[in-house]
UniProtKB/Swiss-Prot annotation:
Keywords: ATP-binding, mRNA processing, Nucleotide-binding, Nucleus. GO terms for biological process: mRNA 3'-end processing; tRNA splicing, via endonucleolytic cleavage and ligation. The gene is cbc. It comes from Drosophila simulans. This is Protein CLP1 homolog. It is found in: Nucleus. Required for endonucleolytic cleavage during polyadenylation-dependent pre-mRNA 3'-end formation.
Amino acid sequence: MSEDHGKDYTLESDSELRFEIEQKDAKVLVSLVSGFAELFGTELVKKKQYEFGVGAKVAIFTYQGCVLHVSGKMDVCYISKETPMVQYVNCHAALEQFRMEAEEKDRYGPVAMVVGPMDVGKSTLCRILLNYAVRVGRRPLYADLDVGQGSIAISGSVATILIERPANVEEGFAKTAPLVYHFGHKSPSGNSVLYNAVVSKMAEVTLQSLNSNKRTKSSGIIINTCGWVKGSGYAHLLHAAKAYGACAIFVLDQERLYNELLRDVPKGVHVVLLPKSGGVVERSKELRHEARDQRIKEYFYGNTRAPFYPFSFEVKFQDLRLYKIGAPPLPDSCMPIGMKAEDNKTKVVAVTPTPALIHHVLALSFAESVEDDVIGTNVAGFCCVTEVDMERQAVMLLSPQPRPLPPNALLLWSELQFMDNHT
């Protein structure tokens, strides 16, 4: 561990400065002294100070060379010449070629999926490709299918946003008006049938939305995926590629997956094998759990730069319309005539409030009734059960919006839990 009160780092062309922060109260300040540099595709402004805190894993890259001033406590800090950024910018150039053709012929722009096992830098590559697209005047859509470590909405959901400007260096992309669908589990294995149904619905709605704006239509979609790439996880990748009509699949750091996709996807789909960055860090189960918790906490409370002040209010059991998607599995022989066991996986069932509901995150659906297409309806937001009072027949909810719940509010159960100990 080194404490750095201020040091200039001189980077040659095509190199990057990497550092990690693991200490809870540590703070690192970075500024660009001279030259040109970028963080995951976002250009750094000269002399502006950028602040990074605990959990930050940063790689600042320069094409032409630069000097960076860095101060603060870091667990690791070094300069590397071994970087895949040139291959990544070549991927952007290929996508840009597709976009120019799409613009000329008034067609859909490229739909590119980024796939690979856990901890290879999938979301980082998505961020780089999106930033480069925006910097040349495009307006792509970003679809995040990673229900375990999503970067748009909280875990347990899939989401899409329109990218109109480069990501903020410290905070990432603006999460304005996301299209969010509820899944309710931390992995597609929680309910494979439901996961495919939700991905298909979001793909359908997203592709339709491309027609409403010519610039977005030709800009296309960048898709982030889960790190589960074997067995059923691989089947989910194939399903997503088909649902979105992917024309390019970027495979990070796994030749086996690359060769399987070459074999199984239609011939017109470009499958490209890419190296992962040496700066990618493997995360333990505990770190993943902490990251999920942090995303939920930020949803309700914001961060130090932009704090939110959520509301707590009581809802009586009789006013709570709470449901879960997916009934307990039954053998085909026990199912009604014409139904299969997998139909149970997408069944909407009522949930009776019990003390077991405490700390669970609930999604507020735009559906007004269980007679509606609940699975195919996006969600307005989330709340969390902080208290269950069986005596008073009421629950206490933590919500970004004040009471009451909207009329006919339909809440959907999630296996995700959040301990609200914010002070």
